[in-house]
């Protein structure tokens, strides 16, 4: 059974994910259909960032996955050399 702290952290992560999903969905799908002079546009970044931010996040994810795999492979090679 998860502790209270684990449940709170999990709930917080889900809440943040839902907020980001709602914001991004509104930004990308609904905002182009709203008049550009409407006051809601001041709460969103320019549309170019709708592509650049996920692209940057994806590249960072690939970078960290690659670094992790490299670290694990190098560490396992050191352990293999010690055993021999």
From Swiss-Prot:
Compartment(s) where it occurs, according to its Swiss-Prot or TrEMBL record: Endoplasmic reticulum membrane
Recorded metabolic or biological pathway in which this protein acts: Protein modification; protein glycosylation
InterPro entries per record: DPM2
Bilayer-spanning residue ranges: 11-31, 49-69
Coiled-coil stretches noted in the UniProt entry, renumbered to this chain: none
GO biological process: dolichol metabolic process; dolichol phosphate mannose biosynthetic process; GPI anchor biosynthetic process; protein glycosylation; regulation of protein stability
GO MF, any single term: dolichyl-phosphate beta-D-mannosyltransferase activity
Keywords annotated in UniProt: Endoplasmic reticulum, Membrane, Transmembrane, Transmembrane helix
Gene Ontology CC entries for this record: dolichol-phosphate-mannose synthase complex; endoplasmic reticulum; endoplasmic reticulum membrane; glycosylphosphatidylinositol-N-acetylglucosaminyltransferase (GPI-GnT) complex; perinuclear region of cytoplasm
Result of changing residue 23 to S: Abolishes interaction with DPM1
Membrane topology recorded in Swiss-Prot or TrEMBL: Multi-pass membrane protein
Keyword GTP-binding annotated: no
Family classification: Belongs to the DPM2 family.
Self-association state and partner proteins as the record states: Component of the dolichol-phosphate mannose (DPM) synthase complex composed of DPM1, DPM2 and DPM3; in the complex interacts directly with DPM3. Component of the glycosylphosphatidylinositol-N-acetylglucosaminyltransferase (GPI-GnT) complex composed at least by PIGA, PIGC, PIGH, PIGP, PIGQ, PIGY and DPM2. Interacts with PIGA, PIGC and PIGQ.
Annotated function: Regulates the biosynthesis of dolichol phosphate-mannose. Regulatory subunit of the dolichol-phosphate mannose (DPM) synthase complex; essential for the ER localization and stable expression of DPM1. Part of the glycosylphosphatidylinositol-N-acetylglucosaminyltransferase (GPI-GnT) complex that catalyzes the transfer of N-acetylglucosamine from UDP-N-acetylglucosamine to phosphatidylinositol and participates in the first step of GPI biosynthesis. May act by regulating the GPI-GNT complex.
Name of the protein in question: Dolichol phosphate-mannose biosynthesis regulatory protein
Source organism: Rattus norvegicus
